[in-house]
């Protein structure tokens, strides 16, 4: 299948042509795809001939619906793209934090030792996620380790979700507090060592984080 006709098939699916017929006009599709109406008509005929859509004319206009073959193609494409994009790693850029990491790591240190099996360095490595779109896209298939919250000196500390990761062979964990102030583009990483020193990192350096 040509890439351009694939884009048209995706467009038809987004317009609702799965499980029902929809009315389309060549003029509307030509604007959406930035091609001539004649080109859209030719692509529709190609999709019909290849068995990806049903197409017929009516008084209302051109009616189209994806066939089972067309739906299966998009499902397969989605699976392949998801595997490529969300395969358990993060590419990011080292940034400076807001200075609260050391305090919180010290408070949770006994529980981190119990649930993750290492004594954490009192601080976090902050990484701005460049790929995939958000930290949650990379972690969507990983199972978190829940570090339970607690109360100390009248102050409540909430649950923390931890995901085991590896950076250049060093084991650590991405931690996501239930009361985080960070946007989904920021990953906070704890480890048994100071990662900036161990990996000779500075702000702006690129890192690859493997979810394990």
UniProtKB/Swiss-Prot annotation:
FMN binds at residues 180, 188. Pathway: Cofactor biosynthesis; FMN biosynthesis; FMN from riboflavin (CTP route): step 1/1. InterPro entries: HTH_MarR-typ, RibK_CTP-dep, Riboflavin_kinase_archaeal, Riboflavin_kinase_CTP-dep, Riboflavin_kinase_dom_sf, WH-like_DNA-bd_sf, WH_DNA-bd_sf. CDP binds at residues 97-102, 193-196. Residues 88-212 are annotated as: Riboflavin kinase. The keyword Nucleotide-binding applies. Its EC number is 2.7.1.161. It catalyses: riboflavin + CTP = CDP + FMN + H(+). One of its GO terms (molecular function) is magnesium ion binding. Mg(2+) binds at residues 124, 126. Keywords: Flavoprotein, FMN, Kinase, Magnesium, Metal-binding, Nucleotide-binding, Transferase. Its cofactor is Mg(2+). Residues 1-87 are annotated as: H-T-H motif-like. Binds 1 Mg(2+) ion per subunit. One of its GO terms (biological process) is FMN biosynthetic process. Catalyzes the CTP-dependent phosphorylation of riboflavin (vitamin B2) to form flavin mononucleotide (FMN). Belongs to the archaeal riboflavin kinase family. This is Riboflavin kinase. It comes from Pyrococcus abyssi (strain GE5 / Orsay).
